[in-house]
């Protein structure tokens, strides 16, 4: 078979809808990166540096990430960066014999596994959304988003440790950490078979810049740096991340608003009678049967509102107050 035909059969592109509507589908931050910080980025850029292959990761950025992590047991050799958290996930699928994940989960795990031709195992979460008993061990990498995407619920520390104790490598995807406020990064003191992945896309309004980071053992970081592309994160993207971390209080205040809106929406949705999760992300998740879900999606499309559809229901990104009020109104009408 022609290699291009084989790729077309096993992999498929990640597609998004047009942005000609109220868009609450991709868990993007409703607030733009502040204009004055954009100006600061460009003031700090050195035009002469643009002509060179810039260090990735930038040592100064690693120092700022370590300060943000605020631990006393991590050093520069425990941190690296990726072209978005997605690149880190993609590379990890090349590093291990088999990838394991628990749907409903981040859809790109399956997309990436198929794209790279990796062996993978999908074992659904239990009915109460807990990690099931699964036969894994050395050679496996187990991807666990915490808070989970798309449901937003949080896995217990004991669930994560149960997988770690099997000897499998755990990729703990903390893309939504800032909206939850609790991390299991301290487990790195106890387990070498753990990597914590984070992103600047969500809380820091930098999805377009494609920058994430990974924290793990020195041994893993060395292996990851050998596998990833050289110069994988641009000079400009790294500068945006450094400026964001220098002004983290701005983003912490915005995160506080998003969390308050999330809790407000959860309270209202429960009163409306919707079955929702206890989301700790920047989104809410409503369980729905297929027929009801399709009717809701049709209703929202007619109102020029886009949300994300999953087999188990719909996920709604927390937007600005007026956007949240708009979709709450339509959900009430639909109910």
From Swiss-Prot:
Modified residue annotations for N6-(pyridoxal phosphate)lysine: 202
CDD domains: AAT_like
Reaction(s) the record says it catalyses: L-histidinol phosphate + 2-oxoglutarate = 3-(imidazol-4-yl)-2-oxopropyl phosphate + L-glutamate
Pathway assigned in UniProt: Amino-acid biosynthesis; L-histidine biosynthesis; L-histidine from 5-phospho-alpha-D-ribose 1-diphosphate: step 7/9
Top-level lineage group: Bacteria
Molecular-function annotations in GO: histidinol-phosphate transaminase activity; pyridoxal phosphate binding
Gene3D superfamilies, A to Z: Aspartate Aminotransferase, domain 1, Type I PLP-dependent aspartate aminotransferase-like (Major domain)
Keyword Amino-acid biosynthesis: yes
Similarity annotation: Belongs to the class-II pyridoxal-phosphate-dependent aminotransferase family. Histidinol-phosphate aminotransferase subfamily.
HAMAP family named among the record's database cross-references: HisC_aminotrans_2
Protein known as: Histidinol-phosphate aminotransferase
Organism in which the protein naturally occurs: Thermotoga petrophila (strain ATCC BAA-488 / DSM 13995 / JCM 10881 / RKU-1)
Lineage: Bacteria, Thermotogati, Thermotogota, Thermotogae, Thermotogales
